[in-house]
């Protein structure tokens, strides 16, 4: 475990201006702000005014923009504050390596891999919201966390739920885990209807408030596909132990089934601050003004099997897990390229999964990753191959 004064935790937030990052700071302030947390570093990308405001408000020691061209703008925005400023990939690594016992890894995409890995190697306790660390880097990242000696605390609501109900002394008795999925905005849509949806329609999630890309990933169920791969690495599971069930109310966040037939579930209103608060204050629980479940008003919980004909991302995740090696990075890289093309209106909604499958077919013989350079190389090949299919 990372060292530090438990009465005031030193925290770095990678990706503080995004959806997870802003909610993390909301939780930090609700838990006492600067009286309970020391903010070692905050990082963002293009939203310089918000990053500067966050850094000043929280008394951060260091503020970093991932965009090297915005360094001067950030420095000017923080003039006279005494807050250090850095930019680019080296700045992100500097933030991750700064002495802080706790780190929120909320940078979206491969840009978060390097700095999160750096934090793992130095032994930080990591609240993990970046999917690529596990989907693309998998065993390499888990190995780095183990060698560093820190803890890995999942922030995804589904994995956080499993983490909460998984009995460490009973891991040998785990039979399966069941990831719940809302089904997204197209749960009841036909294939023909799904052919004509736009990014604006796909971003409208029925239960959760999220950013554009993750909302569309939820609509296509690629988000759930990535969570399946993450769960395999986080909880050391076989692919056949991971199930997905559609649960439209998003009240049960995930379940663990044991060999005696028992199933333990974590329930709560759909609010990402619950998982964030749990990860930031672990092993203690914190007081948060989250809406409480009223079971009398809830009345019912619904479940249905996912339709993999309409949502083939789940099938592709199983294929990637069974193949092992570098296929998680291939799936993710191809998905990211297809997602960008869909957002720009260059391909249809259903074409995203079709492109990912074709890329996996073409790159099925890539060797397993030995280093992070192998991961980045596979990701680049997948993106280039997908781009070629889109043209």
UniProtKB/Swiss-Prot annotation:
It catalyses: 2-C-methyl-D-erythritol 4-phosphate + NADP(+) = 1-deoxy-D-xylulose 5-phosphate + NADPH + H(+). The lineage of its organism: Bacteria, Pseudomonadati, Pseudomonadota, Alphaproteobacteria, Hyphomicrobiales. Pfam families: DXP_redisom_C, DXP_reductoisom, DXPR_C. NCBIfam families: Dxr. Pathway: Isoprenoid biosynthesis; isopentenyl diphosphate biosynthesis via DXP pathway; isopentenyl diphosphate from 1-deoxy-D-xylulose 5-phosphate: step 1/6. Keywords: Isoprene biosynthesis, Manganese, Metal-binding, NADP, Oxidoreductase. Catalyzes the NADPH-dependent rearrangement and reduction of 1-deoxy-D-xylulose-5-phosphate (DXP) to 2-C-methyl-D-erythritol 4-phosphate (MEP). It is an enzyme of class 1 (oxidoreductase). GO terms for biological process: isopentenyl diphosphate biosynthetic process, methylerythritol 4-phosphate pathway involved in terpenoid biosynthetic process. This is 1-deoxy-D-xylulose 5-phosphate reductoisomerase. GO terms for molecular function: 1-deoxy-D-xylulose-5-phosphate reductoisomerase activity; manganese ion binding; NADPH binding. Belongs to the DXR family. InterPro entries: DXP_reductoisomerase, DXP_reductoisomerase_C, DXP_reductoisomerase_N, DXPR_C, DXPR_C_sf, NAD(P)-bd_dom_sf. 1-deoxy-D-xylulose 5-phosphate binds at residues 131, 157-158, 182, 205, 218, 223-224, 227. It comes from the Bacteria. Its cofactor is Mg(2+); Mn(2+). It comes from Sinorhizobium fredii (strain NBRC 101917 / NGR234). NADPH binds at residues 17-20, 47, 130, 132, 211. Mn(2+) binds at residues 156, 158, 227. Its EC number is 1.1.1.267.
